[in-house]
Amino acid sequence: MNILRRQETSIESTADFQIGDQIRLGKYTATCQAVTNKAAIFLLDQYLDKAYRMNPTDTNRGGYARSELRHRIGNAGFVAKDDNFRAVRGRLIPFQNGDLLRIPTVGEIFGDDPFYERDGHKQWELMKKRCNRITERDEGEEYEHGWLWNKVQHGDAKSFFAAVSYNGDTECETATEIGGVRPVFQLAF
């Protein structure tokens, strides 16, 4: 028999993070999914309070990089306005594109899937369990789909993006659908 022991410590006194570490951000929690040589990558355990669409029109032209959703959550203004991120603002590291927050990729959640735009990411270890891919907006609400970064590649799919379904499988949704947003962010050591 194994014992899972949790020990609470302040984020200010932590020199490093491990996969599975959980932090509280206001009303949300976030779990460490990966550790690099300079940062820990966290994924919110819940969807943001508000559901968002990917784009105002049914198009995936430009991908996530040119989407309305990215422009809403990726910039420093969103983090500055959202009090839930107050505790970590000083430790956030921008991603390569300059964003402080982004949504996860198909690769990070499910591993490589040729049906979707390739992203070069490996599946996060914790995402190998379906229960870690499923989430809700508020405790007790029904599960819903949540956006992923990738465009659908095949057929006449000019308006579809990948999503995590309510049961933890991959699915695709049109860009104007309203869906859950589960931000990813990096914290410096």
Cite the ranges covered by each PLM segment.
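Collagenous Gly-X-Y triple-helix signature in extracellular proteins
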Residues: 1-189
